[in-house]
């Protein structure tokens, strides 16, 4: 029951900028009303993740067949990138996560979900790293659909589309658990989100911490406010909480190792 409540809570928070009502109330996609500052946006952090149960089967759409790439290691592709934003914000992606136009994510027609991809805008040389968690774009010549934040960061929003090169970043499955210090000098934290809206981050920190029964704190640097859960000393517990956070819609969350804080 707590899990259902947490899921609904995150949906409401993430959908704060989307229009009310049924699915895809907007006939045309558009950027958010408030211009985005990209200084605080971090690239997706590549890490090993098992492929999702949803969104990874071969499929047919509009008379075309699409086969999911089984071994994406070394995969590269060049073509047009587009972006999607407010119309889809707060709705489900192909693997059941919640689309957040402010996260560093993307859609691809055949890469396994999730995959991490370096995207380089060959028109201006800017690049970023995104996490693929959706399917698309289904327009001839387009190879990847970027979240609004990712597109803005490399200059795709302004032009609508751009020439890009994508390269898959492969992270092998860990064969050993995370090393532990002899003196237990290391701890783990989960970075959930970063934002310039301090009150929103504080509210989320309180709600998420309560619903996951986990300590939370906010660190602020240069008007960028980062929400963390932790610190934890147990690696298995940290991994379990990370999966819960991602299931709640924060697919860009990741684990950081820190030196133990003085009591």
From Swiss-Prot:
Gene3D superfamilies: RlpA-like domain (2.40.40.10), Sporulation related repeat (3.30.70.1070). A lipid is attached at residue 17 (N-palmitoyl cysteine). The keyword NADP does not apply. GO terms for biological process: cell wall organization; peptidoglycan metabolic process. HAMAP family: RlpA. GO terms for molecular function: lytic endotransglycosylase activity; peptidoglycan binding. Residues 1-16 form the signal peptide. Its main location: membrane. It is an enzyme of class 4 (lyase). Its EC number is 4.2.2.-. It is found in: Cell membrane. It comes from the Bacteria. This is Endolytic peptidoglycan transglycosylase RlpA. Residues 182-257 form the SPOR domain.
């Amino acid at each position: 029951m707590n899990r259902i409540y947490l899921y609904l809570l995150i949906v409401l928070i993430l959908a704060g900028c989307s229009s009310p009502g049924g699915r895809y109330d907007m006939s045309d996609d558009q950027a958010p009303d408030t211009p985005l500052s990209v200084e605080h946006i971090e690239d997706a952090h590549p890490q090993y993740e098992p492929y999702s149960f949803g969104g990874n089967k071969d499929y047919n759409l509009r008379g075309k067949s699409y086969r999911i790439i089984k071994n994406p290691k070394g995969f590269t592709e060049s073509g047009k990138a587009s972006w999607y934003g407010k119309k889809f914000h707060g709705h489900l992606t192909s693997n059941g996560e919640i689309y957040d136009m402010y996260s560093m994510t993307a859609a691809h027609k055949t890469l396994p979900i999730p995959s991490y991809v370096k995207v380089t805008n060959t028109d201006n040389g800017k690049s970023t790293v995104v996490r693929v968690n959706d399917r698309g774009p289904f327009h001839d010549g387009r190879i990847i659909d970027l979240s609004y934040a990712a597109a803005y960061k490399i200059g795709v929003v302004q032009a609508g589309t751009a020439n890009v090169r994508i390269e898959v970043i492969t992270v092998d499955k860990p064969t050993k658990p995370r090393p532990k210090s002899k003196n237990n000098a290391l701890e783990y934290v989960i970075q959930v989100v970063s934002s310039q809206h301090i009150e929103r981050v504080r509210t989320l920190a309180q709600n998420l911490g309560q619903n996951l029964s986990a300590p939370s704190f906010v660190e602020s640097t240069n008007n960028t406010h980062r929400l963390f859960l932790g610190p934890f000393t147990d690696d298995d517990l940290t991994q379990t909480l990370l999966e819960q956070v991602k299931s709640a819609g924060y697919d860009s969350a990741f684990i950081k190792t820190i030196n133990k804080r003085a009591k």
